[in-house]
Swiss-Prot record:
Domain of life: Eukaryota
Quaternary structure (record): Component of the 66S pre-ribosomal particle.
PANTHER family membership: 60S RIBOSOMAL SUBUNIT ASSEMBLY/EXPORT PROTEIN LOC1, 60S RIBOSOMAL SUBUNIT ASSEMBLY_EXPORT PROTEIN LOC1
Record family assignment: Belongs to the LOC1 family.
Disulfide bonds: none
Gene Ontology biological process: intracellular mRNA localization; mRNA transport; ribosomal large subunit biogenesis
Main location as per UniProt: nucleus
Subcellular location: Nucleus, Nucleolus
GO CC terms, sorted: nucleolus; preribosome, large subunit precursor
Primary role: Required for efficient assembly and nuclear export of the 60S ribosomal subunit.
Keywords of the record: Coiled coil, mRNA transport, Nucleus, Ribosome biogenesis, Transport
Official protein name in the record: 60S ribosomal subunit assembly/export protein loc-1
Length: 209
């Protein structure tokens, strides 16, 4: 048998001059693996083509990943609306009176409204009382004037009666009696006319609500 050579260093095969041996090929390819495939130029063109036109799946994924902003982040200005305290429009519902289950706030609102209404009623009551007092004062004044008129009429009647007695005692004629009766009638008629004219001038007020 021929003697075999032992190679301690794996790179010694190249130095020894053995080019076609399997050990030399293994030493060259040791640590580096080359891919046996298509050339670089074609692969580069395929990558650029895929980047230029994205697939449908990529578009769907992008749409799904879109960020959603809240109303506070967008800072949308709120419109001027009349909403009671503690009432907010719930998101996703129609506009309307959707009240929150807050009994305290509702009680405060009712108390404010009731106080305003009571104030209006009180003012109406005060006005009605004032008008009633004015009417009573006018009635008292009219009664006083009527009493004064009657007193004057009685005085004139008494004076005329005294005159009649004197005329009878002195033996006066009937003409004097007729004149006295006319004077009494004229005075009484004048008194009633004066009262009627005053009543016409009186102002009537509308009844309070």
């Amino acid at each position: 048998m021929a003697p075999t050579k032992t190679i301690k260093n794996k790179h010694a095969a190249n130095k020894s001059g053995i080019k076609g041996s399997k050990d030399a090929e293994r030493s060259r390819n040791d640590g580096v693996l080359k891919s046996k495939g298509k050339p670089k130029g074609k692969a580069h063109t395929l990558v650029t083509a895929s980047k230029g036109r994205p697939n449908i799946q990529e578009l769907i994924a992008r749409k799904k990943k879109k960020k959603t902003y809240s109303e506070k982040e967008l800072a949308i200005p709120e419109l001027n609306m009349i909403t009671p305290v503690g009432v907010t429009k719930p998101k996703g519902k129609k506009k309307g009176k959707v009240f929150v289950d807050d009994k305290e706030s509702m009680a405060t609102i009712l108390a404010i409204v009731q106080a305003e209404k009571e104030g209006q009623i009180e003012s109406k009551m005060i006005k009605a009382r004032q008008m009633e007092e004015i009417r009573e004062a006018r009635r008292a004044e009219a009664e006083k004037k009527e009493a004064e008129r009657k007193a004057r009429l009685e005085e004139t009647k008494d004076s005329l009666r005294k005159k009649r007695k004197r005329s009878k005692q002195s033996g006066g004629s009937k003409g004097d009696d007729d004149d006295d009766s006319r004077d009494v009638k004229e005075f009484s008629s004048a008194g009633t006319k004066a009262v009627k004219s005053k009543k016409k001038k009186s102002v009537s007020f509308a009844a309070p609500e």
